[in-house]
Each structure stands twice: as C-alpha cells, then as structure tokens.
C-alpha cells in the first residue's frame, strides 16, 4: 500500500569487486537489513522470479543497467535487484549483466520481503520452488511510493515505468 512502511527484511548478497569479473573468483556473501540500509534513502527494488531466466535476463534487468544514471539523477540512492536465488548466483548474474557496482543483486531470503506484499510465485511445478513475483517498488525513507506488479512481460515493473513514477 502506498505510504506504508516496507518490512524490515534480511537480504543476502555478494558485494561487487572487480576481481569477480574473472568468473573463476567467488565472492563471500554478506547480509543487510532493509531498515538499516535504506533509512533516509530513495531505493528502487526490482523483483524477478529468477536469475538467468529468459524474460528477466533479456527484458527486465538490462534497462535498469542502461538507465542507472537517469535513475540516480532523479534522486535514487540505490537500485536493488532481488530474487529467491542464492547470493552466489545473483552475483554471477550481475557480472553477466555488466552491472558492476551500479546495482545490487540480492537474495530476498526466504522471500520474506516479497511475502509482505503478497508478491510470491509457487513455481514448484517447474522445479523452482517459491520465488519472488515480477515487481518494482520505490521506497523513500522506508515508505512505499510506488508498487507495480506484472504477471508476464515487464510493464508496471519496467525501468521506463519506474522512471515515470520518480
């Protein structure tokens, strides 16, 4: 709901470092709490069902990478791509998307953040288990300013839509 406070959830990620560009190097995951990290900041959270999946890789995440400077020019402090994937997979995906340290790729641990918004998908029939739905959220000082969810192709959760809401 617009104006509501985002949940204080745990996210796990591998911080970017140039050494990770060598695909044989594996970074060490760490975690953060949403309230601690995002208090006083404007954050765009982009949730995807899965790293390296066709729609997420081809259509959803690349425009966020391409438009990062435009997003930052509109006051965005951080863009975070979240999914149920483990932080190692998300780190590798961020590298292949050429995101460097411009975006954070983080695991929504047990989908707790997404569950708060009823934005999860049970993809057990496809062998993928519980996943985050495809959505985008703008939070400003922990308050929801925009929430857009998609069932198929990115529309409400696209970079273009998010930019129009900033």
Swiss-Prot record:
EC number in record: 1.11.1.24
Family per record: Belongs to the peroxiredoxin family. Prx5 subfamily.
Pfam family, one: Redoxin
Species of the source: Malassezia furfur
Keyword Protein biosynthesis: no
Self-association state and partner proteins as the record states: Homodimer; disulfide-linked, upon oxidation.
PROSITE patterns documented for this protein: THIOREDOXIN_2 (PS51352)
Keywords carried by this UniProt record: Allergen, Antioxidant, Disulfide bond, Oxidoreductase, Peroxidase, Redox-active center
Protein's name according to its UniProt entry: Putative peroxiredoxin
Reaction(s) catalysed (UniProt annotation): a hydroperoxide + [thioredoxin]-dithiol = an alcohol + [thioredoxin]-disulfide + H2O
Misc note: The active site is a conserved redox-active cysteine residue, the peroxidatic cysteine (C(P)), which makes the nucleophilic attack on the peroxide substrate. The peroxide oxidizes the C(P)-SH to cysteine sulfenic acid (C(P)-SOH), which then reacts with another cysteine residue, the resolving cysteine (C(R)), to form a disulfide bridge. The disulfide is subsequently reduced by an appropriate electron donor to complete the catalytic cycle. In this typical 2-Cys Prx, C(R) is provided by the other dimeric subunit to form an intersubunit disulfide.
Signal peptide: none
């Amino acid at each position: 709901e617009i104006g509501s406070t985002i949940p204080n959830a745990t996210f796990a990620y591998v911080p970017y470092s140039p050494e990770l560009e060598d695909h044989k190097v594996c970074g060490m995951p760490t975690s953060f709490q949403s309230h601690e990290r995002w208090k006083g900041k404007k954050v765009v959270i982009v949730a995807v069902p899965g790293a390296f999946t066709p729609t997420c890789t081809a259509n959803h995440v690349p425009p966020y990478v391409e438009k990062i400077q435009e997003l930052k020019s509109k006051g965005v402090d951080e863009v975070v791509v979240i999914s149920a994937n483990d932080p190692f997979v998300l780190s590798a995906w961020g590298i292949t998307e050429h995101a460097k340290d411009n975006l954070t790729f983080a695991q929504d641990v047990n989908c707790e953040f997404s569950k708060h918004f009823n934005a999860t998908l049970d993809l057990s029939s496809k062998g993928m288990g519980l996943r985050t739905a495809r959505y985008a959220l703008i939070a400003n000082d922990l308050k929801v300013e925009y929430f857009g969810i998609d069932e198929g192709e990115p529309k409400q959760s696209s970079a273009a839509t998010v930019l129009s809401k900033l």
